[in-house]
A protein has these predicted regions:
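Short amphipathic alpha-helix that is part of the acyltransferase structural core
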Residues: 1-36, 138-139, 150-184
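A conserved beta-strand-loop-helix scaffold within acyl/acetyltransferase catalytic domains
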Residues: 19-65, 176-236
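Short hydrophobic/aromatic beta-strand or adjacent loop that forms the aromatic wall/cage
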Residues: 36-38, 136-140, 197, 284-289
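A structural microfeature
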Residues: 48-55, 131, 136-139, 210, ...
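A short, internal acetyl-CoA/4′-phosphopantetheine-binding micro-motif in the GNAT/acyltransferase core
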Residues: 61-64, 68-82, 107, 231-240
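Acyl-donor-binding surface of acyltransferase catalytic domains
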Residues: 78-156, 290-292
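Conserved acetyl-CoA-binding loop-helix of GNAT-fold acetyltransferases
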Residues: 78-95, 231-234, 240-253, 257, ...
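Conserved hydrophobic beta-strand within the GNAT/NAT acetyltransferase core sheet
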Residues: 101-104, 229, 263-267
Length: 295
């Protein structure tokens, strides 16, 4: 089935008035993405719904059997049109043996983390009517990078700096052993196509214990230097030791050195916000992740 991507783009931009996309965005992230298997049609009457299951396996991501996603949905006139469209998509999910459907992002395809129920309350109401339940609230934050960088005390045996060419493979192994496949994918692309200042590595006694990065985050060259902050993580056994703060300081310094005007990220939880607030980040938006159990 060939879809009119321009029409879906028009419908998206009409509904998500504050979160515009281009035809190229929809093609690269959804319709022509090797990791995404769309459910078509994705629009009917006055409604659209970007529903999908996994296409090609996404690196070592293993916890996806029986899961499907809706990456964005909306309507212009009748909510009933959206309800009918998604109910039809539920039938195809069931045929694909998918019993749980999430309104959320689907790595590496990323539009929005979930439903911004402050900006688009009518979407959440429609999903609730379809039987979706809220399972998580996530937080987006941003910083103007104008705040002074807090001082931190040195940690014995700790070295934090931009990634070295000689340790790129070791870093990917570290990420693969400790963090989600999406983090591995993003780091791999930035290490191959970006610049060293985009990736900061923490080493304890010459062993990698944490890292962080930033990139453009979207567009054809999303891996280039830009304002999208993260991912950022520390080995679980080394957390609460000040390592995360040292990584953050180095990342912010590098972003300032590259003349970036702000830093933002789309997804964290309430518990993690305290460290970011120390470095000038403020909450910009919140999103709800929603789930529908089909069987």
């Amino acid at each position: 089935m060939i879809e009119d991507v321009q029409e879906v783009t028009r419908m998206w931009n009409e509904f998500f008035s504050e979160d515009q996309v281009s035809v190229g965005d929809l093609k690269s992230r959804f319709y022509d993405n090797e990791f995404v298997k769309p459910i078509l049609p994705s629009y009917k009457e006055t409604a659209f719904s970007l529903a999908a299951s996994r296409g090609n396996p996404f690196f070592y991501e293993s916890d996806e059997e029986g899961k499907g996603w809706i990456l964005g949905a909306g309507f212009s006139n009748q909510r009933e049109d959206l309800l009918n469209l998604i109910n039809k998509q539920f039938e195809e999910f069931a045929r694909r043996k998918i019993g749980r459907v999430y309104y959320s992002n689907m790595v590496p395809t990323y539009f929005l983390p979930g439903v911004d129920d402050a900006r688009y309350p009518q979407l959440k109401l429609a999903l609730l009517e379809l039987g979706f339940k809220q399972v998580q609230r996530v937080i987006s934050m941003e910083s103007g990078l104008e705040s002074a960088i807090p001082e931190t005390r040195p940690i014995n045996g700790m070295d934090v700096s931009a990634v070295r060419n000689t340790e790129k493979n070791d870093l990917l192994t570290f990420i693969g052993n400790n963090f989600p496949a999406d983090w591995y994918y993003r780091a791999k692309e930035v290490l191959e196509h970006g610049i060293s200042e985009q990736v900061v590595v923490a080493r304890k006694l010459n062993k990698i214990v944490g890292y962080g990065m930033f990139s453009a985050g979207s567009g054809k060259e999303w891996y280039a230097s830009g304002e999208r902050f993260g991912p950022f993580g520390v080995l679980e056994s080394e957390r609460s030791n000040g390592i995360g703060s040292m990584i953050l300081i180095n990342l912010i310094r590098n972003m300032k050195k590259l003349k970036l005007k702000k830093a933002y990220f789309l997804w964290t939880d309430e518990r993690a916000t305290h460290i970011y607030k120390r470095f000038g980040f403020n909450i910009s938006r919140t999103f709800v992740i929603m789930e529908k159990v089909l069987f």
